[in-house]
């Protein structure tokens, strides 16, 4: 199977149909493709591949002027480039293979470490992975070649670090094999897209080709990224021959294109597609030594000391609550800010922003998050970002009050949730109410974005509470509280009023 000519990428076409596209189709027919039809972490990996091909085909763009002029010539340039490098995109065969290192051999004659290709799908219940989307356990699954291609690419971008098998790469031990030559499990670091469960963000265009163009980063911007020395070349052009291939390893780890499509794991697929040889590959520095262009860097003060951190995804906090950080243009804040592609946007027009992440706890994959938001141009300036942050803060303060109100209600009905042995139940009751609140608040997100664009003054919390967003937050909290706290009996009603006073302390009449 060749990724340039065989269909393997699930996409949504403009006619509404979902069909697989070839890598060449992505560029030549990209104006007919509305969007990708994949999971969040797969989207991130695929977009990185598309951007890598586009940059390599253009050998740039060097600056903003080149970026503005390159869209028209991108389809032909990418088509010619993929024809030239087509042999590097073979999934199987005796020659060069896509994202598979050469001359990889098992550490011992009968190596039973990690043979199943199901290890490539982090959503399956295999090894240490929890079941996210899978209902059938066990190894030995068979995957069609088109799915294997996507799994391989995504695994190289997101594989969590930890214990891993070992192998010989051109007769040399794979990185992390500390017991060499004794065959024992090795160690690996996170692949470059995973550290900190970072949120990735990409501005979205009218079609897939426009999205690719919108996310191209100029060479003069690339070299400002920590840990990046140059635009570089894709890893398939300079595939390291062994762990000692310093020149090609430097390209893979310290250049923009080398990192976009990584080889974080040393992999060799069996010809039948059921098994693989898997070991640690190339170690990629992460923040603060290196930064991904799609990540957001924020300033956070801990113990009185401000420092810069990668903005992380959370299963308890939807991405829309971080939009004020995600939309800061990096050009305006040294080392901090949102994705570099924001600098390509017209500051006078609204835009769509896709945000997503694979969330992990150390080596354990937990789940994915994603969201698509229609963002007003006002969010690209500090005044709009601050106003949005104030609106989110109002909601977060209300959510915290809701949790305390639920606890007070239960205390008044004789259910003391502040006892140490009741902690888990208290958290469950509070989180259930908070989940309902945040779900309703997110449905009304356009009201918050409208407040960002509004000329109405919102100088303080009282003004925010009188706004359309403030009324929505109030109503969402009231409904969530009523659902969580029954108020039918006399005692329940008294407890309900006591809790309501916690939720809305300044309300003249808590019973309304």
What does each model-identified segment do?
Residues 150-154:
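Short, non-ligating residues that shape and space the ligands of small metal-coordination modules
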Residues 136-139:
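Flanking scaffold residues of small Cys/His-coordinated metal-binding clusters
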Residues 1-127, 159-160, 164-165, 170-512:
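Extended alpha-helical scaffolding segments
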Residues 144-147:
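Short Cys/His-rich metal-coordination motifs, predominantly Zn2+-binding knuckles/fingers
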């Amino acid at each position: 199977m060749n990724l340039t000519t065989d269909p393997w990428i699930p996409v949504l076409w403009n006619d509404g149909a979902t069909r697989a596209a070839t890598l060449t189709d992505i560029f030549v027919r990209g104006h007919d493709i509305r969007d990708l039809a994949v999971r969040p972490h797969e989207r991130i990996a695929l977009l990185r591949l598309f951007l890598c091909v586009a940059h390599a085909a253009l050998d740039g763009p060097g600056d903003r002027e080149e970026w503005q002029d390159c869209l028209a010539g991108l389809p032909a340039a990418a088509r010619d480039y993929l024809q030239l490098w087509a042999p590097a995109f073979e999934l199987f065969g005796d020659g060069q293979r896509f994202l598979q290192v050469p001359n990889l051999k098992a550490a011992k004659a009968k190596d039973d470490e990690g043979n199943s290709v199901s290890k490539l799908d982090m959503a399956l219940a295999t090894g240490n992975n929890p079941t996210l989307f899978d209902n059938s356990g066990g190894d030995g699954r068979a995957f069609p070649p088109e799915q294997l291609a996507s799994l391989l690419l995504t695994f190289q971008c997101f594989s969590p670090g930890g214990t891993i098998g070992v192998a010989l790469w051109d007769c040399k031990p794979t990185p992390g094999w500390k017991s060499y030559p004794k065959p024992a499990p090795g160690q690996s670091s996170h692949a470059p897209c995973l550290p900190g469960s970072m949120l990735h963000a990409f501005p979205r265009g009218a079609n897939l080709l426009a999205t690719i163009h919108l996310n191209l980063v100029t060479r003069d911007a690339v070299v400002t990224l920590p840990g990046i020395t140059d635009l570089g070349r894709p890893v398939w052009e300079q595939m390291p021959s062994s762990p000692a291939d310093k020149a090609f390893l430097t390209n893979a780890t310290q250049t923009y294109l080398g990192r976009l499509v990584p080889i974080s794991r040393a992999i060799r697929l069996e010809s039948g597609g059921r098994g693989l040889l898997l070991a640690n590959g190339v170690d990629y520095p992460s923040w603060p030594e290196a930064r991904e262009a799609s990540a957001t860097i924020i300033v956070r003060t801990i113990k009185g000391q401000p420092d810069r951190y990668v903005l992380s995804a959370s299963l308890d906090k939807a991405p829309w609550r971080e939009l004020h950080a995600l939309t800061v243009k990096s050009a305006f804040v040294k080392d901090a800010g949102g994705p570099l592609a924001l600098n390509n946007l017209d500051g006078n027009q609204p835009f769509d922003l896709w945000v997503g992440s694979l969330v992990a706890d150390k080596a354990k994959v937990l789940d994915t998050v994603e969201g698509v938001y229609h963002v007003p141009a006002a969010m690209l300036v500090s005044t709009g970002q601050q106003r949005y942050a104030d609106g989110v803060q109002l909601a977060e303060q209300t959510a915290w009050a809701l949790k305390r109100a639920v606890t007070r209600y239960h205390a008044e009905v004789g259910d003391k949730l502040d006892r140490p042995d009741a902690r888990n139940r208290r958290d469950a009751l509070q989180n259930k109410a908070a989940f309902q609140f945040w779900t309703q608040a997110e449905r009304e997100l356009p009201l918050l974005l409208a407040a960002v664009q509004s000329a109405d003054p919102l100088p303080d919390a009282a003004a925010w509470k009188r706004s359309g967003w403030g009324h929505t937050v109030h109503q969402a909290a009231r409904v969530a509280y009523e659902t969580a706290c029954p108020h039918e009996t006399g005692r329940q009603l008294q407890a309900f009023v006591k809790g309501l006073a916690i939720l809305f302390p300044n309300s003249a009449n808590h019973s309304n």
